[in-house]
Regions:
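A short alpha-helix capping/helix-coil boundary motif
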Residues: 1, 15, 29-30, 79
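A beta-strand edge to alpha-helix "cap/lid" segment located at domain peripheries
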Residues: 3, 34, 48-131
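Solvent-exposed, amphipathic alpha-helical segments
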Residues: 3-17
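Surface-exposed charged/polar residues within alpha-helices that form helix-capping/stabilizing sites
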Residues: 10-13, 25, 53
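Short, well-ordered alpha-helical segments enriched in acidic and aromatic residues
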Residues: 17-30, 34
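Short histidine/acidic/glycine/proline-rich micro-motifs that form metal-
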Residues: 37-40
Length: 131
């Protein structure tokens, strides 16, 4: 548990770093990230681009580790993201949203697959609605 918690803390720091490659470094070479049941980002290059989308859209992006649940072989990484949508084409609106990722870990101790989830309707309301 301590090792996995340390990994989760490092993953959180990677999301806060502004460097999407640091996020991808936590995935196996052919690892995948799927957000809200969408098309998976497969491989580190694709994961870099997925992370870059959030980081570019929210230059002040901050992710906070809310908890780590271990139930069976798939740990759940619970997080809260805050940031202001001031990137290209941004609305200037502030977002605060919580969600989680269900991880399948590789034999190397990296993420082989992450299934991420958050309330997309709430996200859309926060990003696009008038204050």
């Amino acid at each position: 548990m301590d090792e996995l918690l340390g990994f989760a803390r490092a993953y959180t720091a990677a999301w806060c770093s502004g460097d999407p490659a640091k996020v991808a470094d936590h995935y196996s070479r052919d690892g995948s990230l799927t957000i809200n049941g969408g098309s998976p980002s497969i491989g580190r290059d694709a994961i870099v681009e997925a992370a870059r989308g959030f980081m570019d859209g929210f230059p002040d992006l901050h992710v906070e580790l809310e908890g780590l649940k271990i139930d069976g072989d798939s740990p759940e990484y619970h997080w809260t993201l805050t940031g202001t949508n001031t990137g290209p084409g941004g609305t200037g609106r502030r977002v605060r949203i919580s969600g989680f990722e269900q991880w399948t870990m590789s034999s190397e101790g990296l993420i082989a697959a992450s299934l991420g989830s958050y309330d997309a309707a709430d996200w859309d309301r926060q990003v696009n609605s008038e204050p």
